[in-house]
Amino acid sequence: MAAPSVMASSLAAFQARARHCLEASQQQVCEQALLEAEALQRRASARSAYPCQTLLLGVQADLVMQQLQAGRGAQAVADLQVATRGCAGL
């Protein structure tokens, strides 16, 4: 189970960290964003917010790809914005 600070992560804080990962490729930031994405997608699942969960799974894939230096650049950032809108209120 994730640390309480990860579980309490707000969607806005996650978005900022994930965007930083996607734009700057800093491994530590990417790892934290990935942990936050996991916590958020589990929260979405627990609330039966399956469209949001699906969007977050896509963001997780983008974060992993970024860690592997195979990121999708601007498309990944655009998908993060879509996920943030699709998960409003999570």
Where are these regions (language model features)?
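Residue-level detector of intrinsically disordered, flexible termini
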Residues: 1-2, 75
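Surface-exposed polar/charged interaction patches
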Residues: 21-24, 40-47, 90
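Mid-chain, structured segments of secreted extracytoplasmic proteins
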Residues: 45-89
